[in-house]
Amino acid sequence: MIKNLNLLLRNFVCLLFLLFVNLFFSQIDNEKFTVVLDAGHGGKDPGNRGNGYYEKNIALSIALKIGKELEKRNDIKIIYTRKTDVFVDLFKRAQIANKAKADLFISIHCDAHNSNAYGAGTFVLGLHANQRNFEIAKKENSVIFKEKNYEQNYGGFNPNNPESVISLVLMQEEYLDQSIVAANLIQEFFTKNLKRKNRTVKQAGFIVLKYTYMPSVLVETGFLTNKNEGKYLN
């Protein structure tokens, strides 16, 4: 399993570098390309706990290891929304990225469904195409109920109401095309390089992607509810 994870990390770093070169070729000379790695959940929010694994721990481990590899490059600057097991409000994660004027925001998560579901999927902000996408976003967005003053911070947004999602989409529309390109490259990497089941690029209403003023994606690296995939990710 360690060998598989190391392979994942090495290939993911290569993928991101190619993404930087091909997608963001207009980057100013000598200016570092800034990537924000957002380890989902943390602290009092464990995320999903399929098969006894903690999503918050696995997401953090992946983010730190990818960041460590990317930090070896002089032309890339890495910023983390968290580097320890702490709780960070969703809107503050976006604030970190915006303050850094980041070029790319990647939120790292693990999925949960039934024990047979497996594979990796990548999301960009958008309207839910189906009930399953809505349920995934609702699960990730429900963390706001753990935050203080969440009603004021998110303008009355209700994760349980599909109509609330419409207002989310407008702010990220400017970056949607680049987000989709990035998501497609990440998804292609998962399926072609790591031979993971292709759960495709999807759109859903994730709050964490709403307030970022840059291309942004959310990666569901696999299903902790699947025993084999849980071991793979852990």
Each language-model region and where it sits:
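Flexible hinge/switch segments at interdomain interfaces of large molecular machines
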Residues: 154-162, 218
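Active-site-adjacent mobile loop/cap segments within catalytic or ligand-binding domains
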Residues: 36, 47, 110-111, 164-234
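Catalytic-core regions of hydrolytic enzymes
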Residues: 27-157, 172-184, 188
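Short alpha-helical linear motifs
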Residues: 143, 160-161, 227-228
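Bacterial N-terminal signal peptides that target proteins for export
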Residues: 2-13
